[in-house]
């Protein structure tokens, strides 16, 4: 959730170095499989839930992969299969999608099905009543809070009653990036699920990195250091409130437009909008990616080949323990769009946006 797209940018950069990693001697590389297993078992927030009632299957997987590595299988391909078994889009390495059941079961390759799929930040009038804000990333390196507020100011100055917030392609970043948009759509106090850390050295390092200079962060670190490794940190609030001191009179009606690439912080935006905005309807054809139950990721380099990486979530949503996780199926839209995919999605006003604009006018 937090900082995911920045992490993925690092991943892309690291991936460009993989050819050098292919030269790692097989005997040394094999220990990187053991490294992956160790860090998953002691630090991955999803490990207890993903292995529950599947202990024999998990043990057999590890044994088979170790035997295949000993027989000459590429170590890092085996690591990809190992991580893919957990079926978590936040737990990954190069090549994991080929083994992750969800990626195989629910492909969302819009680029292959459309003439051009490259959603870009844009804002413009759709028609006399409707304004479009396209917000395809929560990465603060891609868009600043000032730029987000400027888009909102342009919308309010337009005089349009209705708003389409198009987040197709938004794979995440940082939750704070969308806060001005959430404030704009807010019309009542809402409650959303919190998250909890699975205590480990990596989780402590994560808190220290992002909140270690705050009193609250230091207090959390102290409690984590008193908690046995592998347990979830007790005493955390299971929910949090979404509350602002005022409600914007516009938009009168709003649409949140999603697709199967929306994940992580993008999905958090969907959940928070649903929790606090009755005037907003979620539109889409596909469910979202389903990449939010386990989050707050750390990037790790393999000790034997430091050009290779793995990404690991340190927190679990409190909804998981209650059986309300979203990762298996993603978040469904309120209204399913049955139109064909648009030919192009860049900075244009596409067919879906025009259809949604008309539908907003017909709502009671």
Task: Show the residue positions of the predicted features.
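Active-site neighborhood of thiol-dependent amide/isopeptide-bond enzymes
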Residues: 255-266, 283, 291
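A recognition module on extended beta-rich or small alphabeta surfaces enriched in W/G with H and D/E
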Residues: 318-338
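Hydrophobic h-region of N-terminal signal peptides that target proteins for export
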Residues: 9-21
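Flexible, low-complexity junctional segments that flank or bridge functional domains
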Residues: 22-223, 238-239, 250-255, 276-280, ...
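Short, conserved, surface-exposed binding loops centered on an aromatic residue
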Residues: 243-249, 272
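Sec-dependent signal peptide recognition
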Residues: 2-10
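Mature hydrolase/peptidase catalytic cores and their serpin-fold inhibitory cores, especially
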Residues: 226-242, 251, 262, 286-287
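Non-catalytic, well-ordered alpha-helical segments in soluble enzyme domains
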Residues: 266-279
């Amino acid at each position: 959730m937090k900082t995911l797209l920045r992490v993925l940018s690092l991943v892309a950069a690291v991936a460009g170095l993989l050819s050098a990693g292919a030269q790692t001697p097989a005997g040394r590389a094999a220990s990187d499989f053991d490294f992956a297993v160790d860090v998953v078992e002691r630090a991955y927030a999803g490990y207890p839930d993903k292995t529950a009632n599947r202990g024999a299957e998990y043990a057999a997987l590890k044994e088979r992969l170790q035997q295949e590595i000993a027989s000459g299988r590429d170590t890092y391909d085996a690591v990809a299969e190992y991580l893919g078994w957990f079926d978590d889009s936040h737990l990954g390495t190069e090549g994991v999608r080929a083994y992750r059941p969800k990626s195989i079961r629910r492909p969302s390759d819009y680029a292959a099905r459309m003439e051009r799929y490259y959603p870009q930040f844009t804002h413009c009038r759709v028609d006399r009543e409707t304004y479009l804000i396209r917000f395809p990333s929560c990465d603060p390196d891609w868009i600043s809070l000032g730029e987000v507020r400027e888009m909102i100011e342009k919308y309010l100055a337009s005089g349009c009653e209705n708003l389409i917030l198009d987040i197709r392609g938004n794979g995440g970043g940082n939750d704070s990036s969308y806060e001005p948009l959430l404030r704009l759509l807010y019309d009542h106090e809402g409650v959303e699920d919190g998250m909890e850390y699975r205590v480990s050295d990596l989780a402590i390092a994560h808190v220290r990195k992002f909140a270690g200079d705050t009193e609250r962060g230091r207090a959390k670190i102290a409690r984590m250091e008193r908690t046995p490794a592998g347990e979830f940190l007790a005493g955390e609030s299971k929910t949090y409130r979404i509350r602002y001191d005022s409600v914007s009179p516009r938009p009168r009606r709003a649409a949140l437009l999603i697709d199967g690439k929306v994940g992580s912080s993008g999905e958090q935006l969907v959940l928070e909008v649903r929790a606090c905005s009755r005037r907003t309807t979620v539109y889409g054809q596909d469910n979202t990616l389903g990449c939010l139950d386990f989050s707050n990721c750390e990037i790790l380099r393999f000790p034997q080949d430091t050009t290779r990486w793995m990404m690991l979530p340190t927190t679990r949503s409190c909804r998981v323990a209650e059986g309300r996780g979203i990762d298996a199926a993603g978040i469904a839209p309120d209204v399913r769009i049955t139109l064909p995919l648009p030919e192009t999605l860049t900075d244009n006003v596409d067919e879906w946006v025009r259809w949604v604009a008309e539908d907003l006018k017909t709502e009671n």
